[in-house]
């Protein structure tokens, strides 16, 4: 009987240790004393993948980068990724009007919320099925999560708001 209890306790301790090890990789805290770092390409093991697709209105290649050790809101993810983002005069940090000076000021002055006549940016999040899903909330209120991809696509008039970035998602865990 004693050896059965002893083996049961050892087995329980092993199961708890395995569970902790598996869980600690996904919920590991970000060390805020280490600055965010940026690498080209999609994240493979940690961080937040950021995709900027300039759409069919531009010949610019898509920006694809992995931002590691970042904690904050999606709006601030642009700065961590060293990308220039501009809001509108009316909503300077509430509505993405221009990314990396696209569209140009001549095309969209960004004084008010851009309408569909000049095109606008659409914001997407990656889901567990490696699909882009249109975000129901904006970048200034969405908290970045390690292991979740964020994407932007510039849409021309007539394109569906559901038209996602043309970059395929890759599945990865969060091993910061």
Identify the role of each PLM range.
Residues 2-176:
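Ubiquitin-like/PB1-type beta-grasp interaction modules and other compact soluble beta-rich domains
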């Amino acid at each position: 009987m004693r050896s059965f209890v002893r083996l049961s306790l050892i087995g329980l301790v092993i199961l708890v240790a395995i569970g902790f090890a598996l869980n600690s990789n996904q919920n590991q805290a970000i060390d805020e004393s280490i600055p965010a770092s940026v690498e080209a390409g999609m994240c493979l093991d940690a961080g937040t993948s950021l995709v900027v697709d300039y759409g069919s209105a531009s010949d610019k290649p898509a920006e694809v980068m992995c931002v590691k050790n970042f904690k904050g809101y999606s709006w601030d993810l642009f700065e961590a990724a060293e990308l220039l983002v501009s809001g509108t005069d009316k909503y300077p940090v509430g509505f993405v009007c221009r990314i990396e000076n696209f569209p140009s000021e001549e095309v969209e002055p960004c004084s008010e919320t851009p309408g569909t006549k000049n095109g606008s940016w659409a914001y997407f999040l990656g889901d567990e099925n490696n699909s882009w899903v249109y975000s129901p909330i904006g970048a200034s209120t969405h908290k970045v999560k390690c292991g979740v991809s964020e994407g932007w696509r510039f849409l021309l008039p007539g394109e569906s708001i559901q038209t996602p970035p043309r970059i395929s998602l890759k599945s990865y865990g969060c091993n910061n």
